[in-house]
């Protein structure tokens, strides 16, 4: 096993811009120029072995990043390595051969690596733009649902897989004892079942906040990684290992872990229930919202302190509204009201809809107050009576 210093040295060298004859730049151009995996005849020379080079470079970066993250935790270096690995695998699948047997495997790796690099929106788009026929394993399908935050689909898929008779422990044991079973096929079934069972535990952890369920999921995936290693099942070793890092990352940045359990002063009675309802309502959305984005984390942490003053300057779509929602949650739990001032009427309407969607399930009213033609009696009433 390499030391942390050795892994850091390797990844620092492997992520230098323009390494290997600008391989990643050539790979991006190669993927954009081709159609169904075939380059046009007038394409410039991008390297006869570019596909092999991209795969080898991507796997090397991915292995090193996972190993360093396991030893020393996430860092700027591991994030950069995951991003460069994702670039390599994205180049391998974009506009690729639709009949390639490993197209689904490589796409899953690209999306997972982007997610671990902190680019969950890019990971989402890697999966959201494709058709269903990807030649993927059950474990890869489950990871796809997790990355797309379609937890209803994830729950249904793993339930169906785990309830299918041939995937039960007794049936698998009987097949092995019968002597007629293909051992590699049985091991693949065991590994996919373990991944699905782990994600069932993890889904429950995201729903309830139970640390024990997260630890059970992580333990199952650690077992799967060891079994895949011993069985020399290379694809499922990558998938189970990536899945373990994915749930680590998601849990670390989940709302359960980042919204304080200790209530603000004076909110001891209301805050625990409001916190639970807030997280549950976001989890229950069609596209579940279970974690904080990298752009939100520092501001969100400060917004939980009701004694703090805060100005948050972030680009469009970087998640400012979620920070405001967390600040509002802490304020409302202290039995105080929230006033939102926006510079545009259109933004007022959008913010009103967003806050109503979030806070109506918690029992709070959101006013419609735009002030276009002075202050009416109804406006005065809204200011006096509405919580937001």
Language-model-detected regions and their locations in the chain:
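N-terminal helicase ATP-binding lobe
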Residues: 1-388
């Amino acid at each position: 096993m390499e030391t942390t210093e050795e892994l850091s040295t390797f990844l620092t060298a492997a992520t230098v811009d323009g390494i290997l004859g600008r391989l990643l730049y050539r790979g991006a151009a190669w993927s954009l120029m081709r159609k169904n995996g075939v380059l046009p005849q007038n394409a410039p020379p991008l390297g006869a072995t570019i596909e092999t080079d991209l795969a080898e470079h991507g796997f090397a970066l991915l292995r090193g990043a996972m190993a360093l993250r396991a030893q020393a935790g996430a860092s700027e270096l591991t994030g950069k390595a995951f991003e460069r690995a994702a670039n390599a695998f994205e180049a391998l699948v974009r506009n690729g051969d639709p009949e390639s047997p490993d197209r689904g495997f490589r796409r899953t790796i690209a999306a997972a690596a982007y997610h671990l690099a902190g680019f969950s929106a890019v990971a989402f788009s890697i999966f959201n733009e494709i058709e269903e026929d990807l030649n993927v394993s059950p474990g890869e399908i489950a990871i796809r649902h997790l990355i797309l935050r379609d937890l209803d689909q994830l729950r249904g898929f793993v339930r169906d897989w785990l309830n299918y008779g041939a995937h039960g422990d007794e049936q698998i044991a009987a097949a092995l004892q019968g002597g007629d079973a293909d051992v590699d096929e049985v091991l693949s079934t065991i590994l996919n079942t373990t991944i699905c069972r782990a994600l069932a535990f993890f889904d429950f952890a995201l729903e309830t906040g139970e640390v024990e369920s997260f630890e059970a999921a992580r333990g199952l995936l650690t077992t799967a990684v060891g079994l895949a290693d011993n069985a020399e099942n290379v694809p499922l070793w990558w998938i189970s290992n990536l899945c373990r890092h994915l749930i680590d990352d998601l849990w670390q940045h989940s709302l359960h872990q980042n919204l304080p359990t200790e209530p603000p002063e004076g909110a001891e009675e209301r805050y625990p229930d409001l916190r639970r309802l807030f997280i549950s309502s976001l989890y229950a959305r069609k596209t579940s919202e279970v974690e904080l984005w990298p752009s939100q984390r520092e501001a969100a942490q400060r917004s939980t302190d009701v004694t703090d003053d805060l100005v948050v300057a972030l680009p469009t779509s970087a998640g400012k509204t979620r920070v405001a929602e967390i600040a509002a949650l802490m304020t409302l739990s202290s039995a105080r009201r929230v006033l939102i001032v926006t510079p545009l009427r259109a933004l007022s309407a959008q913010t009103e809809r967003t806050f109503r969607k979030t806070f109506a399930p918690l029992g709070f009213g959101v006013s419609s107050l735009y002030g276009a033609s002075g202050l009416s009696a109804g406006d005065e009433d809204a200011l006096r009576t509405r919580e937001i």
